[in-house]
């Protein structure tokens, strides 16, 4: 199981479908996960540091976890079946709750816990976008990688990632 970082939310055209883009913390694979509009907004708002005047659903969940005296330890994306990703919220006291990856990531960002992906999921749905240079990865190269990936996302559909 490897740790991933949230790259951000992209929008697949022409369907206008949001895609959550994760990248291995210690690798070059990206994991695209198609998600709903409201979850995409929740993730984007948190990444941008926007504080809503009233708690959104994922803020409420964060607050409930704390109010009930528990702590979220990590988020795990654990499976991919027929194009659907599955995740678990891992709490203290060995409590595990199944959740959608989009909700799990939105909560993880708010709580500040790591996100992990099972190797089998990365092997099945991860995309390798190699660096153009073996030298130090510069900001320009990383931006170019993301731009190439955006172009790739524009050319694929969720059906391309369904298991055969």
Curated annotation (Swiss-Prot):
Q: Which InterPro entries match?
A: BFN_sf (IPR036104), Bi_nuclease_dom (IPR003729)
- One Gene Ontology cellular component: peptidoglycan-based cell wall
What name appears for this protein in its UniProt entry?
Answer: Uncharacterized protein Rv1829
Residues in BFN domain copies: 1-129
What are the GO MF terms of this UniProt record?
nuclease activity
The beginning of the lineage is: Bacteria, Bacillati, Actinomycetota, Actinomycetes, Mycobacteriales
PROSITE patterns on file? BFN
Q: Name one Pfam family in it.
A: BFN_dom
């Amino acid at each position: 199981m490897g740790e991933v970082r949230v790259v951000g939310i992209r929008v697949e055209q022409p369907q206008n479908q949001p895609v959550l883009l994760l990248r291995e913390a210690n690798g070059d694979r990206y994991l695209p996960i198609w998600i709903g509009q409201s979850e995409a907004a929740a993730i984007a708002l948190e990444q941008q540091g926007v504080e809503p005047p009233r708690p959104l659903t994922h803020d409420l969940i964060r607050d409930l976890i704390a109010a009930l005296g528990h702590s979220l330890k990590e988020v795990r994306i654990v499976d991919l079946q027929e194009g659907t990703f599955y995740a678990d919220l891992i709490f203290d006291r060995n409590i595990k709750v199944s959740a959608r990856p989009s909700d799990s990531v939105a909560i993880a960002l708010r709580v500040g816990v790591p996100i992990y992906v099972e190797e089998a999921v990365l092997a099945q749905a991860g995309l390798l976008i190699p660096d153009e240079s073996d030298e130090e990865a510069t900001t320009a190269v990383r931006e170019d990688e993301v731009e190439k990936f955006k172009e790739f996302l524009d050319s694929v559909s969720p059906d391309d990632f369904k298991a055969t």
